[in-house]
């Protein structure tokens, strides 16, 4: 019956009646038409008729919101009698479709790039196979003739037996490697093509506003998703079983190899029974929740619990700080977009490799048509590379560096989560009354069920949309060789700039250059790259002191030994500063000395330059190299070269000294010229004469050597060549270096070639080659570096070379950049006459030491000293002017951050001469400031142009006497608030830091005002807020404040992300894709197990060579062995750590959303889309047949 109007309600129209369904839902009966309706007929008069008329969260007439326990919120259109899971008031679905279409264009470009990369590798493989056959034929011919072209009568060493053997083995390894890479890329291309086609189908299916899923369809999809998840779970269990069987097979191979006998059944062997018994014992121990020896040894030890509790709290703080740092990093526009840029860089590099291989093909026994075809292909490649070099990429370089930093932080975060999980399990095993793991005491609660891999029993969309499927793709790493190449491209010239020469690394044998702070880049700089890095969250351990007792009080600038009056008395006063430029132009150092500039810490003549020498700035062509490379890798002064230094002056008239204090160092080793400051007790060292023209005419090459003990890899850097005019080379020819590690090995790439360059006075190469060799084998080898020229007829002619004995190579993970003389090929001695501690370059130097002119050197040093004194006086005047008009400096940032940000303008920094104090690991000039009182001028040298002075230069203070953060002197900050300022810069750090006495702190302090306030009764400093006012809003209790904040937090926690039909379709297709790829992995594992079982049945005791040579197979077998040896407790800890890592990743996304950098739902949707085209193959296919 019609309701009576009352309480402001409109009455129902005539003939209408309100009724209730069996479940209590209200519906309306129209007796006039004898029909029922869910729509209140009065809503036509009270509700908006369209979405355009809606205000706030209103729904128009005919729409109703419902809730399903399995789906969640859904919406009913009573007019059209349809349901949908998208909110019709939101525009999110349209934004999703737009993002999907945008990503399809990006993915299509990436697919095209990788297909082209695959095609280039195919060309390289075909060329390498042909070259391998021809080299084998040439070797057979030369072996039968018993003649060697490596003699003093011939300069052509194309078919020298040693070089030919190395080239054959290198080509053979190149063929094997290209086959493995092509097999891997083929599978990866297939996955990406399938993912791209899947996204296209989703776009066609879900485009348009009326293509969403209804309620019943969504429930059917959920049911299908559950079944797929069960299949994936069973597949993962089968994968674990296959991995364990692989571990057992590998163990059997190792046992047979060590014992020399084959065991038919591993389970019957006593060794295996012992292993099984030990594992059972560990499993029994894990059932009692005792983790390791700590729980058994100190179950009731209170001190142990306190120690673990402190470590646990410290790990949580570290994890929170890492989350903050990750959230502050700017994310890329699309997940995987940076991978596309990397592949474009690698495509350029592969084309360079192909071009180089086309230039060095064997012309013998080739038809004229084939030679013309190869020449046309070579010219086409050159044109493509010239076009690629014209695009700027500084922004790309910054993005790549940012990505490297993100990877470092993610790795640290993963290690911290594992440590946190381990400490928590140990605390649990000690006592049941240990720390609580509730969300209130831990930012990443292990007890939280969010982000779990297990699906909720209700099967809600929240569980289905978790990062289970998409999380696994984030931790996949790039191929090792690709990563090595990319890191070197980043480090070359401070970032990859295609407008300059593009670096080529032969045969993918490049080494990963250090990218962490405190390590050196590979731009040919003469630095020592230490393997020890400083964590990103830690500041520099030592900065310049501002106290009066500081070493900065000296007048001598750093790196300028010529100012020492005790060594050169009166020399600085004999020469007028105005006469210096004229006299300076006459000397051989010429303008190169002036080009370096006095603002770069006077780095030309330093007695202790081994820690970070400066050969890059010696050449005019290298002075344009961006400065960020130079600031990234400078190491401490203490980490100097153990035997010799690599700093060399432009003029080639430097002294040869020994850098070590003991008699172990070899003076003049390998023809190395070194610039160093002369101490009073070292005057017996003989400098070179200014008139010795033979030194200037000697061609020299700068070579860097390093052995990485972690990866057992030997790295050779061909940095630069100078004084090429010593050889008469036609302009039509091109020069390059050929590097050979002799005697050659069949299983190691031993021959490499740099890219070719036209003959100029100085040539910059910056090529890096990597050889996987053990220390013992490396000490038995000799490095041979030949300077070769190639004419249009592809005739390889060896002009000069040098040989370096590796018997005394220090294995310290540091790069040693040294200059070597290039002896003409007719004068180069045979390697049989080498001495272990003396190299041919060193012996060739001995006759050059006879003509000595000490007066010329003294005059040069005197003029330089006078110039430095004049510059000091000018700088002192400029400093006085700067003190009268001080510039505002930014709040305290550490030295590392400031110089990294300022590296984008290397020219300005070169002129400003901003130094670092003793022990600092980063400076624009790679040579650190030496210790001692002569370093005061390091911070007193302003820029030559004050207008170019970078803003925000930090105030350097002594960390040993001051524990406060450096703040702006003009910034009104109370001393009591310094801790809070520090907490804003480093969040989640306790504010209760014990600050030592400020009595001996350097620098001026702001006025200390003492005032006692009731609102701040525990302090005696100036109040930041207004004085105490009773009953004011700010004085409300914490209980009231918590009550106000709790509803907001609760709503945020309960707020579910908006789900659309597109999200549901992506989840379904991602599950199907994951299941398909898992089946491929299982098939590959079954094939590998079958192959190993067949080899075992045939009596083989060693693993196949293809498995041993492939790093991916080695990684797979190590992972299988690790999983087989894990106990149940360790497996549980790994699962907890993975769950915690997933929760931490959600926290990072939430923090990014709070900082308004990127909405969380946008991040999640982009990850879903990128999952389909980011195929990472963890199980490689079976290796190809060997050559």
Curated annotation (Swiss-Prot):
<feature type="coiled-coil region">
    <location>
        <begin position="302"/>
        <end position="423"/>
    </location>
</feature>
<dbReference type="Pfam" id="PF00397">
    <property type="entry name" value="WW"/>
</dbReference>
<keyword id="KW-0678">Repressor</keyword>
<feature type="modified residue" description="Phosphoserine">
    <location>
        <position position="1017"/>
    </location>
</feature>
<feature type="region of interest" description="Disordered">
    <location>
        <begin position="830"/>
        <end position="849"/>
    </location>
</feature>
<keyword id="KW-0677">Repeat</keyword>
<dbReference type="InterPro" id="IPR051105">
    <property type="entry name" value="WWC/KIBRA_Hippo_Reg"/>
</dbReference>
<dbReference type="GO" id="GO:0046621">
    <property type="term" value="P:negative regulation of organ growth"/>
</dbReference>
<feature type="domain" description="WW 1">
    <location>
        <begin position="10"/>
        <end position="43"/>
    </location>
</feature>
<protein>
    <recommendedName>
        <fullName>Protein WWC2</fullName>
    </recommendedName>
</protein>
<dbReference type="InterPro" id="IPR001202">
    <property type="entry name" value="WW_dom"/>
</dbReference>
<comment type="similarity">
    <text>Belongs to the WWC family.</text>
</comment>
<keyword id="KW-0805">Transcription regulation</keyword>
<feature type="compositionally biased region" description="Acidic residues">
    <location>
        <begin position="875"/>
        <end position="884"/>
    </location>
</feature>
<keyword id="KW-0597">Phosphoprotein</keyword>
<feature type="region of interest" description="Interaction with PRKCZ">
    <location>
        <begin position="1026"/>
        <end position="1045"/>
    </location>
</feature>
<feature type="coiled-coil region">
    <location>
        <begin position="859"/>
        <end position="885"/>
    </location>
</feature>
<dbReference type="GO" id="GO:0035329">
    <property type="term" value="P:hippo signaling"/>
</dbReference>
<dbReference type="GO" id="GO:0035591">
    <property type="term" value="F:signaling adaptor activity"/>
</dbReference>
<dbReference type="InterPro" id="IPR037771">
    <property type="entry name" value="C2_WWC"/>
</dbReference>
<feature type="coiled-coil region">
    <location>
        <begin position="224"/>
        <end position="256"/>
    </location>
</feature>
<dbReference type="GO" id="GO:0005829">
    <property type="term" value="C:cytosol"/>
</dbReference>
<dbReference type="GO" id="GO:0019900">
    <property type="term" value="F:kinase binding"/>
</dbReference>
<dbReference type="InterPro" id="IPR000008">
    <property type="entry name" value="C2_dom"/>
</dbReference>
<feature type="coiled-coil region">
    <location>
        <begin position="121"/>
        <end position="194"/>
    </location>
</feature>
<feature type="coiled-coil region">
    <location>
        <begin position="1063"/>
        <end position="1143"/>
    </location>
</feature>
<dbReference type="InterPro" id="IPR035892">
    <property type="entry name" value="C2_domain_sf"/>
</dbReference>
<dbReference type="InterPro" id="IPR036020">
    <property type="entry name" value="WW_dom_sf"/>
</dbReference>
<keyword id="KW-0804">Transcription</keyword>
<dbReference type="GO" id="GO:0000122">
    <property type="term" value="P:negative regulation of transcription by RNA polymerase II"/>
</dbReference>
<feature type="domain" description="WW 2">
    <location>
        <begin position="57"/>
        <end position="90"/>
    </location>
</feature>
<comment type="function">
    <text>Regulator of the Hippo signaling pathway, also known as the Salvador-Warts-Hippo (SWH) pathway. Enhances phosphorylation of LATS1 and YAP1 and negatively regulates cell proliferation and organ growth due to a suppression of the transcriptional activity of YAP1, the major effector of the Hippo pathway.</text>
</comment>
<comment type="subunit">
    <text>Forms homodimers and heterodimers with WWC1 and WWC3. Interacts with DLC1 and PRKCZ. Interacts (via WW domains) with LATS1 and LATS2.</text>
</comment>
<feature type="modified residue" description="Phosphoserine">
    <location>
        <position position="286"/>
    </location>
</feature>
<feature type="region of interest" description="Disordered">
    <location>
        <begin position="438"/>
        <end position="464"/>
    </location>
</feature>
<keyword id="KW-0175">Coiled coil</keyword>
<keyword id="KW-0963">Cytoplasm</keyword>
<feature type="region of interest" description="Disordered">
    <location>
        <begin position="874"/>
        <end position="963"/>
    </location>
</feature>
<feature type="modified residue" description="Phosphothreonine">
    <location>
        <position position="999"/>
    </location>
</feature>
<dbReference type="GO" id="GO:0008285">
    <property type="term" value="P:negative regulation of cell population proliferation"/>
</dbReference>
<dbReference type="GO" id="GO:0035331">
    <property type="term" value="P:negative regulation of hippo signaling"/>
</dbReference>
<feature type="domain" description="C2">
    <location>
        <begin position="697"/>
        <end position="820"/>
    </location>
</feature>
